[in-house]
Amino acid sequence: MMTAGHPGQLADAVKLGHRKFPTGVTVVAAYGSTGPVGLAVNAFSSVSLDPPTVMFCVARTSKTYASLLAVDRVCINILSEDQSDVARTFAVSGGDKFASIRWHRGETGAPVLDGSAAYFEAILEVRLPAYSHEIFLGRVVASSTEPGKRPMVYYDGSMHDVDGHLLDGAR
């Protein structure tokens, strides 16, 4: 078991600890003044059902961060286990991430990624600074699930299916 005594060691221990906590894989997408923008996010959670509210966190160093500050409508796409290529596309900076994937504009105008296991369209109502990140709270105004689609899971630095199998090409 790894424990840490000073700040550098503590940061490494915390990173390793987070790798042991499985999360879903989401793409937060918005339609801004220059077109669609998006990024992969695993810091996502339900906050409330009354009213339906979700949250996600974005690093302030992300190239998508400024675009998200400029919009008030987003779509949080829960990726399915057959979308590892989509996850890789949105996990890197730069380029037209929407050129190689199928998507459409949802009820709010935000990009909905075709083939996702589920999605939540939300109106951003609260933005909270949190050290190196920003916490976004959004009131859900539309949501859908795709029957038969299973979510992708991220843990130990890799993408897996819900049975724990490493996804093709994932790392």
Feature-to-residue mapping (PLM):
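Basic, polyanion-binding surface patches
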Residues: 1-171
